[in-house]
Amino acid sequence: MAKVKTSYVCSQCGYETSKWNGKCPNCGEWNTFEEVELAVRAGGAKSKPTTVRDISDKIVGIDDVDASYNEIRYATGLKELDRVLGGGLVKGSLVLLGGEPGIGKSTMLLQICQYLGQDHTILYVSGEESVRQIKLRANRLHVDSENLYLLADNDCEQICSVIVKEKPEIVIIDSIQTMNISGISSAQGSVTQVRECTNMFMRTAKSEEIPMFIVGHVNKDGAIAGPKVMEHIVDCVLYFEGQRNPVSYTHLTLPTKR
């Protein structure tokens, strides 16, 4: 039988402790700890010994590695975006697109779908809008592609299962703050949910070799809502910034890329 374990996680750096602290000992920020509850196994029964797998056969000499496959990139159709991505989307990469709500993140991603959908299958997953709302917005942007598929859901485990089964060539998650894992008791958008959902999407992207865009909203301080460790989980972080007064414009910045 599972029991509930309570811990505290820093919303800035992801540092976890069993007791609440006013100041995070890892990043030095004040009042950033949030209480989270996790279901853990009761310690009554002894666990079975784990069998260690022999992975020595996976060792490969560096001269024997075929690196040409990793050079395959999907051009997005947006010249500046392709430039900051080093030529386009890499297979198996996870790109975090952050920005204020309403700045145009979803609009830009639908425009990318219009271009990429000519030759590639795309799964657009929304936890914020219904498929009808996405369709109406796509109509306003004149986005029409028979290779674009829509899914309105926020269950991270179910979404990853669909990705593995259907095997789309490109996936868009809009947004990470609306996703959740049922086994975690904390609310959507919490430190634990955002971190673990990001980890799950990353594992799926790598195992299936599918590039993914995930949308992340920024908070009032201009940082992507959720733990800072999320930015270190993904392969690339893009900030979509803009100014409405006196002149309206938007631009992409690339603070992190690995």
Describe every region a protein language model picked out.
Residues 172, 211-216:
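Structural recognition of the conserved hydrophobic beta-strand(s) that form the central parallel beta-sheet
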Residues 21, 212, 237:
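N-terminal, positively charged regions that mediate nucleic acid binding
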Residues 1-23, 28-37, 41, 176, ...:
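Cys/His-rich Zn2+-binding cysteine-cluster or related metal-binding knuckle/ribbon modules and their
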Residues 5, 16-95, 119-124:
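Detector for small/aliphatic-rich hydrophobic stretches
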Residues 250-256:
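Conserved small/polar residues in nucleotide/adenosyl-binding loops
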Residues 193-213:
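Substrate-engagement module of ASCE P-loop NTPases
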Residues 92, 100-103, 110-200:
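Conserved inter-motif catalytic segment of the P-loop NTP-binding fold
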Residues 229-239:
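A short helix-turn-beta junction within AAA+ P-loop NTPase domains corresponding to the substrate/partner-engaging
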